[in-house]
């Protein structure tokens, strides 16, 4: 039974974008960039979750760079413009930059002429930041000779001009790491759909062990075994006659339908969690008949539902 095609969530960023300057006409230039990539710059207070946001965007397909010097941002933007294989990128700029951070407003205004740039500013209440530094036992970047509270206040003051430029400001005080990743995922979900998770469907024989990279494992040894029918013994589940025999039993059809329904329910949730690939394994005794036929059916159904799926019959080469 083909799966019903279900679209993944496509919630896009709700933050209001500021007007950006229009790039000068350059259509006559032979070296004009062929595409205008998306660049998300993450900044904000130390301990506010910048690393978690960067990782969330990386899981959504963004090319990610942490702590890039401000003076290199224009060059990085130029490289993304000239590289169609990087449709979107994310980078972190923060107080570790030191005095170079003062030039960020001018640099950010400049790159907005060549890329679709967004600035995310993360902050948190003092109590939350103090607690996080206490849990990680790491010093505050501005903590030399200062209490952590004074360091936080100093950082707020230094970053105030950049905060005023932000397209999206997030207070992460009440977020767990998991919740923050979900929050970012919901706002950039337009970049992820069925095609953003690679599904590997595998068949195997239990006599050779369960594939160690399996995320989901289903035992199909309850289905009638074609191995006991002489004309099928040396064939595989890819043979039309063998596949037809296995499919002729009501429990086979019901199993395929129920697993298909389960997967169409699970996959959007895996995508929402940022999972990039999933291995679903089906096992029978030798990995020659039943698991092969079932894996092929499930792969076909997933493909018809719009997912990118590949099938691998691990033990079929061991067929007699």
Swiss-Prot record:
Q: Does the keyword Nucleotide-binding apply?
A: yes
SUPFAM superfamilies membership = P-loop containing nucleoside triphosphate hydrolases
Q: Which GO terms describe its molecular function?
A: ATP binding; GTP binding
Q: Does the keyword Transmembrane helix apply?
A: no
What ranges does the record give for the region Disordered, renumbered to this chain? 1-34
Q: Which residues bind ATP?
A: 44-51
**Keywords assigned by UniProt, alphabetized:** ATP-binding, GTP-binding, Nucleotide-binding
Alphabetical list of InterPro entries matching this protein: P-loop_NTPase, RapZ-like, RapZ-like_N, RapZ_C
What's the family?
A: Belongs to the RapZ-like family.
Q: HAMAP family from the entry?
A: RapZ_like
Name the NCBIfam families for this protein.
PRK05416.1
Function text: Displays ATPase and GTPase activities.
Name recorded for this polypeptide: Nucleotide-binding protein Acid_7395
